[in-house]
Amino acid sequence: MELKKLGKVAKGQDGAVFGGMLFRFDATGTCFVYKIRDLSEESTPLCQFVLDKADRIAPHSNSVAFGCARYEEKDEFPLLYSNIYNNYAKADDPLKGVTCVYRLQRQGDSFCTTLVQLIEIGFTDDPVWCSGADVRPYGNFAIDKEKGLYYAFTMRDASQTMEYFSFPMPALSDGIYDEALGVKRVTLCKKDILEQFSCPYQQYIQGAVCHKGIIYSLEGFTDSAENPPAIRLVDTAAKKQTCLTYFKDLGTTVEPELIDFEDGICYYADHDGNVFVLNF
């Protein structure tokens, strides 16, 4: 692997790429939009926006992805997915395993979103998901667009493994109406699991993406010897980890955050906003 620097954007969490634009999210629901072709060391965002209802339910955006389906067929953008992760870790309801689904619309250089659905893992307190004293029991997700699958995966501390679950991708019409948020909430139960498998433990999961059946999952913290920045490749067909690469071997030790593909190109960004093409 090698990194090729493209420029610098706002600090933040994961994000997504679509139509030659990079959408960089922070942990409060704010997104900065950049044209990839215009990236430089002093990149100016095309615009910024705040996710709908972020004052009531704000994703950490530990994992972000565009799906395949659109809210309306004529929409420019597919549905946008962003997870809560640990934003409500100290709340009565920590919203473990919850992903928010948005309709993204553009008018000129302005963007707005509408919260249209919630997807939640309905068994986060079950031993099949958690192992008792997990430090981060919130789970990440990745979407296999080619096969129409929703992958959820979580850190299991007791067994020192990652547990992966696949589900049919929820349709926008699925779910039960949530009066509080005014959208449908899909609860994925154990009976909905298509496949389940274990892989080696990851040291604090960050952004993730599924591309051609491979989950590219980031992990680690800046300059941490105990939890070094790294990327793992998980083959969902073979149900095994096929690659572990430490970013120090690629010339950086900054916390990894964002990863996505467009037109066969892998885009990667760290917490500080450095954006690269990641070549394999």
Go through the PLM ranges and name each one.
Residues 190-236:
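Loop/turn-rich, solvent-exposed surfaces of beta-rich toroidal or solenoidal domains
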Residues 76-142, 146:
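Hydrophobic alpha-helical segments and helix pairs
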Residues 255-280:
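Blade-level signature of beta-propeller repeat domains, shared across WD40, Kelch, NHL, RCC1
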Residues 8-18, 58-81, 130-150, 201-211, ...:
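Structural signature of eukaryotic scaffold interfaces centered on beta-propeller domains
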Residues 3-31, 206-207, 216:
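Beta-strand-rich domains and repeat architectures in extracellular enzymes and scaffolds
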Residues 4, 43-62, 106-136, 174-202, ...:
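Surface-exposed loop and turn segments in beta-propeller and other repeat-based domains
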